[in-house]
Swiss-Prot record:
TM stretches of this protein: 77-99
Keyword Transmembrane applies: yes
Keyword entries, A-Z: Capsid inner membrane protein, Membrane, Transmembrane, Transmembrane helix, Virion
Name of one Pfam family that matches: PM2_P3
Gene (UniProt): III
Gene Ontology cellular component list: membrane; viral inner membrane; virion membrane
Compartment(s) of residence: Virion membrane
Membrane-topology descriptor: Single-pass membrane protein
Subunit: Homodimer.
Protein's recorded name: Protein P3
Length: 104
């Protein structure tokens, strides 16, 4: 046997073991978030934060200033090209083909 070729040592870890470890980490992270929320609720900090956060008429948490545009009818796209442009292009190719055929 050639001793220079490394041999792999089998492990007992599988893909599902890695998934389980990841899920455990996520659950423990969420538990930490819930602990912080509970600590804020017990000291009244959550109520103070809620009182300081303005509530808008529409229930949004922040004001969004977006430019207001009138609704335009959506143009049908075929492979990212407007359908009208595509039809005119194919029509032009058809006319060109008929003209070339007539010149034979």
């Amino acid at each position: 046997m050639n001793t220079s070729v490394p041999t792999s040592v089998p492990t007992n870890q599988s893909v599902w073991g890695n998934v389980s470890t990841g899920l455990d980490a996520l659950i423990s992270g969420w538990a930490r978030v819930e602990q912080i929320k509970a600590a804020k609720a017990s000291t009244g900090q959550g109520r103070v934060e809620q009182a300081m956060t303005p509530e808008l008429d529409n229930g949004a948490a922040v004001v969004v200033e977006a430019p207001k545009k009138a609704a335009q009818p959506s143009e049908t796209l075929v492979f990212g090209v407007p359908q009208k442009t595509l039809l005119l292009g194919f029509g032009g190719l058809l006319v060109l083909g008929l003209v070339m055929r007539g010149n034979k």
